[in-house]
């Protein structure tokens, strides 16, 4: 299995266009050791030819241009992307769908009922695509017991589980969470049995998650915030990290403590907010992650399982 990180930042990217926090300001001025990052997305393949895209960020065109296998050039119109799996309906994970509207071949999109509802009502991106390329929508089972496959992506099997999280602001059920608003996915390579667990939006470790995470050779999970009060402390938001569906890295029950329980797996943080000190490669927080054997995803990162 080949996992390629197309984008590793949370919504807004890094640096964020209107942000002058120490990280964003320092990156622009060249005074901190850090890498630019686009908004989070990965693609996965078992054969290096047919790729499944997870989420479509607003930066998808740039991300495709920077990863040659997604444009193999076999015909006058071509793509290495054979299917799109949407983890949720958040704007930073779906806006890129509009950038993929060209062509006569329908987009093969895999999403839950809740995500489909959001993307045909509150933010009707799928309705808009029907006026261009069109969409073949495939349902995703979320009970963790029934797997699904993506046509034309041989050698891969996917098992999804519902995660507690908030629906997008434009969702018809914004303040009434439903199973399927957000999912985590166990990705299995049927050729060698290797597995990866992908959950860029993970608010808490629910009882059904350890059984899936224990199977994984690689765990890629929510790296949005370092502390629960990160945005509060900077005066940027009135809510805590967990209030908006993101388990912070530090503190009791934080992501570091969780990942310490899976020492045999490769552990990678993704979907990193621009305020998070782990973006600074020489920060004390990054040193602590390294000491624990936890990696920080970056654009262009390749994971081979």
From Swiss-Prot:
<dbReference type="InterPro" id="IPR036866">
    <property type="entry name" value="RibonucZ/Hydroxyglut_hydro"/>
</dbReference>
<comment type="function">
    <text>May be involved in the transport of PQQ or its precursor to the periplasm.</text>
</comment>
<keyword id="KW-0884">PQQ biosynthesis</keyword>
<dbReference type="Pfam" id="PF12706">
    <property type="entry name" value="Lactamase_B_2"/>
</dbReference>
<comment type="pathway">
    <text>Cofactor biosynthesis; pyrroloquinoline quinone biosynthesis.</text>
</comment>
<comment type="similarity">
    <text>Belongs to the PqqB family.</text>
</comment>
<dbReference type="GO" id="GO:0018189">
    <property type="term" value="P:pyrroloquinoline quinone biosynthetic process"/>
</dbReference>
<dbReference type="InterPro" id="IPR011842">
    <property type="entry name" value="PQQ_synth_PqqB"/>
</dbReference>
<keyword id="KW-0813">Transport</keyword>
<protein>
    <recommendedName>
        <fullName>Coenzyme PQQ synthesis protein B</fullName>
    </recommendedName>
</protein>
<dbReference type="InterPro" id="IPR001279">
    <property type="entry name" value="Metallo-B-lactamas"/>
</dbReference>
């Amino acid at each position: 299995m080949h996992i390629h990180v197309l984008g590793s930042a949370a919504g807004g990217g890094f640096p964020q266009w209107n942000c002058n926090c120490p990280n964003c300001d320092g990156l622009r001025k060249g005074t901190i050791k850090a890498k630019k990052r686009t908004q989070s997305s990965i693609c996965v393949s078992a054969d290096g030819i047919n790729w499944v895209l997870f989420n479509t960020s607003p930066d998808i065109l740039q991300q495709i241009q920077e990863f040659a296998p997604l444009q193999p050039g076999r015909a006058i119109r071509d793509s290495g992307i054979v299917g799109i799996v949407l983890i949720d309906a958040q704007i930073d994970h779906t806006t890129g769908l509009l950038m993929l509207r060209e062509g006569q071949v329908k987009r093969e999109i895999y999403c839950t009922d809740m995500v489909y509802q959001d993307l045909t009502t509150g933010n009707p991106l799928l309705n808009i695509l029907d006026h261009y390329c069109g969409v073949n929508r495939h349902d995703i089972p979320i009970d963790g017991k029934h797997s699904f496959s993506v046509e034309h992506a041989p050698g891969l099997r996917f098992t999804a589980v519902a995660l507690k999280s908030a629906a997008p602001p434009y969702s018809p059920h914004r303040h009434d969470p439903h199973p399927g608003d957000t999912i985590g996915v166990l990705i299995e390579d049927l050729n060698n049995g290797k597995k990866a667990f992908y959950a860029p939006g993970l608010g808490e470790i629910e009882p059904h998650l350890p059984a899936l995470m224990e199977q994984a050779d690689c765990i890629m999970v929510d790296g949005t915030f370092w502390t629960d009060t990160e945005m509060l402390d900077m005066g940027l938001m009135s809510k805590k990290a967990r209030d908006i569906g993101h388990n912070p890295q530090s503190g009791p029950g934080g992501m570091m403590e969780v990942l310490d329980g899976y020492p045999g797996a490769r552990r990678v943080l993704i979907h990193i907010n621009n305020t998070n000190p782990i973006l600074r490669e020489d920060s004390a927080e990054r040193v602590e992650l390294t000491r624990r054997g936890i990696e920080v995803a970056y654009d262009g990162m390749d994971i081979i399982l």
